[in-house]
Amino acid sequence: MSFFGKMFGGKKEVAPTTGEAIQKLRETENMLIKKQEFLEAKIEDELNIARKNASKNKRVALQALKKKKRLEKQLQQIDGTLSTIEMQREALESANTNTAVLTTMKNAADALKRAHQNMDVDKVHDMMDDIAEQQDVAREISDAISNPVAFGADLDDEDLERELDELEQENFDKEIIGIPEPTPTLPEAPTEDLPEKAKEKKKATTTTAVEDDDDPDMKQLLSWSN
C-alpha cells in the first residue's frame, strides 16, 4: 500500500494466515543463510589478499583488511537477524500447532455436546434402574422355571427309598432262584484195557442180566461195551 493510501484510509491489506506467515519467514531465512555463505566466502577472499600483500604491498593489504572488517560486521548483523527470524518462525509454528490442537478439541467437544443434547442424566439413571429391575425379574422367572417345586412336591423320600430297597431285594431273589443246581460228577471211564478174563466175566454177567431183564436199554449198553 502507498503512503497516501495509508494516510487517507485506503483499503486495508488482508492479514496473512499463520501458514502464510510461516512460509514467508522460511523464505527469508533461506535468503539470509545464502547471504551468510556469500559473506563468509568474501571474508575469506579478503583475508587471503591481505596475507599475500602483507610484506610487498601494505596498502593493498590494509584495504583488504578494512573490507574484511565491513563484511564481518554485515555478517554479524545477518546472524542476529537470522536468529530473530528463527525464533519468530518457531513461535508461529508452535502457535499454529496449538491452534490446530485447540480447534480439534473444540470440534470434539461440540460433537460430544450434540451427542448428549437429547440425553438427561436423571433419565439415564432411571433407565439403568429399569434394566436392573428387569434383569432381576428375568432371573426370578428362570429360577421358578428351573425349580421342580410343582412336580413331586407330595412325594416322600423315605417311601421312595423303601420301594427301591424292595425292588433290589426282588431282583436278588430272582437271581438266587435262577441259579441251576450243581450236577453230580460221574466217575470217568477207565482208559486202560481190562484183562481178558475180566472182560469175559463182565460180558457174561451183562448178557445174563440182559437176557433175564429183557431191557432194550441194557441191550444197547451191552452193544456199546462190545
Swiss-Prot record:
InterPro entries: Snf7_fam (IPR005024). Keywords: Coiled coil, Endosome. One of its GO terms (cellular component) is proximal dendrite. Residues 169-226 are annotated as: Disordered. Changing R59E: Prevents homopolymerization due to disruption of electrostatic interaction. It is found in: Endosome; Endosome, Multivesicular body; Midbody. Its main location: other. Disruption phenotype: Lethal late in embryogenesis. Dendritic arborization neurons have dramatically reduced dendritic field sizes but increased dendritic branching. Increased ectopic axonal branching. Conditional RNAi-mediated knockdown in germline stem-cells (GSCs) of the germarium delays or prevents abscission during GSC division resulting in multi-cell cysts that share a cytoplasm and undergo synchronous cell division. Conditional RNAi-mediated knockdown in germline stem cells (GSCs) of the germarium produces egg chambers with 32 germline cells instead of 16. The keyword Coiled coil applies. Expressed at considerably higher levels in testis than in ovary. Expressed in midgut, eye, mouthparts and male accessory gland. Homopolymer; forms elongated striated filaments of uniform ~10nm width. Monomers interact in a staggered arrangement mediated by complementary charged electrostatic surfaces. Interacts with l(2)gd1 (via DM14 domains 1 and 3); the interaction is direct and blocks access to the surface involved in homopolymerization. This interaction may be required for the ESCRT-III complex role in multivesicular body formation. Probable core polymerisation component of the endosomal sorting required for transport (ESCRT) III complex involved in multiple cellular processes requiring the outward bending of membranes, including vesicle budding, membrane repair and cytokinesis. The ESCRT pathway involves 4 complexes (ESCRT-0, -I, -II and -III) that sequentially assemble on the cytoplasmic side of membranes and induce membrane remodeling, budding and scission. Some multidendritic neurons possess extensive and intricate dendrite outgrowth known as dendritic arborization that resemble trees when imaged by microscopy. Mutant larvae possess less extensive and smaller arborization patterns giving the name Shrub. This is Charged multivesicular body protein 4. It comes from Drosophila melanogaster (Fruit fly). The lineage of its organism: Eukaryota, Metazoa, Ecdysozoa, Arthropoda, Hexapoda.
